[in-house]
Amino acid sequence: DYADRRDRPFTKARKRHVLRHNGAKDQALITMIWPTRDGEDLEQALQLELLEKIMRIQLTDTLREKLGKAYSPGASSNTSRTYRGYGTFSVNASVDIKEVPATRTAITGTVSALRDAAVSQDVLTRAREPVLESYDNLLKTNGGWLGFVDRAQTEPDRIERYVKGKELLKAITPAQLQAVAQRYLKHGGAVEINVLPEGVDDPMAAAPPS
C-alpha cells in the first residue's frame, strides 16, 4: 500500500502569489488556502466541513453588505484519506479587478470573525440543515449505494462513518467550530493566490499577510 509514500507536506511559502491571465481586463480571482488535517478522525472532518458551509454563508453576507453585489464566493474543506495528516481549507472569490482590495478585506475579516467569536445558533442551523438533508438523501438513489459498494474494500469503514456522521453533525457546537477556526485558519498561515489580468497593475502590491 506504499505506506512510506503517504506523506505530503504543505508548502512553507505562506505568502501572497500573483498569477496573470489573458482574459477580460476586469476579472480577478482571490484564493486563500490553509493546511488542516487528514480525514481519519470523522468528528474533526465533519467540523471542518461544517466550518466550510458557515464560511460560505458568512462571506456571501459580508460581500453583499460591503460591496452591494451578490457575489458567490466559494469555500472548500478537503481532508485526505490517502495522505497522512494532510488536508486543506480554501476560500475563493471571483470579482471585478477594482474590488480586489475590498474583497480581500472582507475575506480576512470573515476569517478573523470566525476565530474571534462563536457563530450564532441560527447561522449554525443554516449551515447544518443542508448537510443533514444530504445524509438523508444519499441512499435514496442507486448512485449512493454504488458509491458504498465501489469502495467497500478500499474504505471498509465508509458505511460505519455514514451511520455515525449524522449524529456527530447534530452534536457540533458553535464553540467547537470557533476552536477549529482558531486551530487551522491562523493569521499569516495561508497561501494566497491572486489571479489578475495581464498588463493591469496589482491593486494589492503592499498587502499584509492573510
Give each language-model segment a name.
Residues F10-K12, L48, L63:
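Extracellular/periplasmic bilobed ligand-binding domains
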Residues V18-L19, D61, S77-T79, G165-E167, ...:
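Generic recognition of flexible, low-complexity loop/linker segments
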Residues D26-E43, R64-A171, V191-L196, P203-A206:
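M16 family metallopeptidases and their MPP-like homologs
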Residues M32, L42-R56:
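Active/ligand-binding-proximal structured segments within catalytic/core domains
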Residues Q178-L196:
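Bilobed periplasmic-binding protein-like "clamshell/Venus-flytrap" ligand-binding domains
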